[in-house]
Amino acid sequence: MNLLLYILVSLQIVPTFYKNEQSFMKDLKVNPGFKLIKVYPNEDIEPPESTTIWIGYSQDALYVFARNYQKGIQASTRKRDSENIMADDWILVYVDTQGRGNEAYCFQFNPLGTKRDFILTEGGSNVEEWDGDWYVDVKNTEYGWDALLVIHFKSISFAKTDWGIQIERYIAKSTELQLLVKLPSFQQVKGIAALKLDFNKIFIESASYSLIPIVELRVEKEHSGEGEDNFYFRYGATARFKEGSGTLLDLTHRPDFSDVEVDIEQINLERLPVNYPEKRPFFIEGKDLISTPIELVRTRNIEYPVAGLKFYTRGKKLSFAGYFVKDSLLKYVGFSRATYSFEKNFILGIFNASAQGSFTLYSMDMNLYIPQVKMDIIGLWGKRMDAKSNIIYVKLKRRQEFKGLGFSLSYLSIDSSFISPIHLIYFDRVKKYSASLNYQFLLSKININVYGNYSTRKDKYTNELISEEYGPGISVSLAPFSFSLGSSRALLNYTGLPDARMDINFISFAYSLSSWKNISLSFNSGKYFGSDLKYIALRLNLSPFNKFNIGFQEDFIDCDIMPEKSVFQIFGEIPLTYAITFKPYLNYKKYKEGYDEVALNGIISYDISSTTGIYLGFTKNLSKNGKKWESNYEKIVFKIKAGYDLMNLIH
């Protein structure tokens, strides 16, 4: 029977057992493998740039080999676990090791060998970070590229039943998606191919344990204004206990995040603070387990942590994460969340947060996904116990992936006295209604998406209007080109300005080959709080010779009530050797009054392992009022971090 027909009809794969990886690779010459099916932008069971997959296993690992035919490979992301990989060429392998059809380990990689891993629940309603023991070996060939994925059984939890497997391949230049099994949703776990293994042949080692002490030593030189240089010697330490990939305990004292890259500045016309993402490792690992539908704790508000404890454990159904942090400003902050995953795409969460002497909160949240209609039903109820203030949030969302109708409807109610320093909620005593609608369709190879949104925020007790926003738009794409046109209308009474209206039209153009090979240009014009606004944004990302990545952003602003005239930024990832990377950043801001500011930042990192490395970072702020530049602040940090797994001494 033809293997492609076999998998489409029976949805079963019975892979061959091999002695080791080498014997699996030798068998590729005689085993025909499985072909992926093109499902977007049009369907084709034999696409010209085809993909052949081989699957096998040994006593300690699962093997997946992919042969990818392609002219003009596009990949530039080199940072592990970066979502930028989604704009590159990539392969994504789902493995449902419990056979329940509601959760899967995910292994994603691009032709550069950059890896991303996560745990996906049915329909993509929840994505959990996960760092497992797996590797991928990629190689460019005359016909495209090859990849070997090896997943060690000891790094995953599994049941001795039929597993599930889905394999996806994305080709960036044509936005082409290929699947092993055609399903209504590319994020669907239920209905993927059955993977039948003989568990009598699998040797399962005892759970792997790690006990890793990590010591950090750093020397800092700091200079502010016209004062003298100040030198500091600082230290920090972390003790980490890890059981497999599911349980982790971290104890940290005087953590340092000087090697964390800076934020790329964004301009927010709504006059609210930008919610920049968390980047500090202590708060990132396990963050997905404490995430709620409305962000009740923003970890970036914990700016100066002195010590911290973190614990999380992931079970088949029950998971828990807890953080307890001592901060220089907020004193003691603690937050935790437990989640229970039911069989039928239903997740229930219980959350708690407290800050010393000022804040105590309990909440419950739920997410129900209905795959037949691609619908999420999301809800949250919480109560600030010290202020007896409630929050209620309900959202109904229908997902639209490639074509068809998508929409969301939501309602948010917050009582008075709910605002706290540890979250990012700017308004209390409010009720907010939001709605969005979009419809996507294809004309030949042209993708067209028409959309609109509306939201209104009112005082919960007086019904006074606080803000109202709406805007239609349309986007058209023919890979690698795209074009969008739309408008944004808003009445933002919370600004307190005499004329609080914002009426802006925009048009944008983009050309994108991969995450670091793209350019976009947008034009915005209209009325902005009673003044004329003209705003041009240019974005350019380059990957010269596929050796390093460099990005440029330029924002030109012409508006009487905005102080900035232009903001120019440079950032990048520049490998100096195999393990040494330089990450530069420059922000040059010009003001209308003739005042200029420059912020320089750079990190040179030598990463020996995830727990050991050497780092050199610098920061320098300059200003010019007239013709002379003055240094306002500068800092240089040299840091050594060393960690070792003590369990290696036992083995």
Protein language model features and the residues they cover:
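Sec-dependent N-terminal signal peptides
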Residues: 2-10
